Amino acid sequence: MPRRRVVGQRKILPDPKFGSELLAKFVNVVMVDGKKSVSEAIVYGALDIIATKSGKDHLAVFEEALDNIRPAVEVKSRRVGGATYQVPVEVRPVRRNALAMRWLVDAARKRGEKSMAQRLAGELLDAADNKGSSVKKREDVHRMAEANKAFAHFRW
């Protein structure tokens, strides 16, 4: 943490094709080894697959999928007198998006389709329908928070 001043959050440029900041952030999450053009090709390919498969607006499906994955609460470990408690805390909006995108990409990488674009499209469509591994991950996190609701007073 800086001692002098709070460092401002760097403004992310919107996506060149659709003009969406959220999609630009998602392209960055998909990116591996700094290969942004490859990442963009994967994401745009996935959106094209979504448009042909579902017949709906691909950006709307993307937004809906992220909405279904975003966690409201998560648990954080808090040590109190020799015991470690899993304390449920509310997730900040920026972290909600970051977690949703990370879970979505992780779930897509574990799928069985041939190309990454197909995996991503499949996971996005599943998430939009409230199915898939990424939605299950969100449910697991919410379940953990619900189970540890008794320790909510340890919040910091």
From Swiss-Prot:
Keywords of this protein's UniProt record, alphabetized?
Ribonucleoprotein, Ribosomal protein, RNA-binding, rRNA-binding, tRNA-binding
Q: Which ranges of the sequence are coiled-coil? A: none
Q: Which GO terms describe its molecular function?
A: rRNA binding; structural constituent of ribosome; tRNA binding
Q: Name one GO cellular component term.
A: small ribosomal subunit
CDD domains according to UniProt: uS7_Bacteria
What GO biological process terms are annotated to this protein in UniProt?
translation
Work out whether the entry's keyword set contains RNA-binding. yes
Question: Cross-referenced InterPro entries, in alphabetical order?
Answer: Ribosomal_uS7, Ribosomal_uS7_bac/org-type, Ribosomal_uS7_CS, Ribosomal_uS7_dom, Ribosomal_uS7_dom_sf
PANTHER family, per the entry: RIBOSOMAL PROTEIN S7
As for family, the record states: Belongs to the universal ribosomal protein uS7 family.
Q: What does this protein do?
A: One of the primary rRNA binding proteins, it binds directly to 16S rRNA where it nucleates assembly of the head domain of the 30S subunit. Is located at the subunit interface close to the decoding center, probably blocks exit of the E-site tRNA.
- Quaternary form? Part of the 30S ribosomal subunit. Contacts proteins S9 and S11.
Its recorded name reads Small ribosomal subunit protein uS7
UniProt source species? Aeromonas salmonicida (strain A449)
The upper taxonomy is: Bacteria, Pseudomonadati, Pseudomonadota, Gammaproteobacteria, Aeromonadales
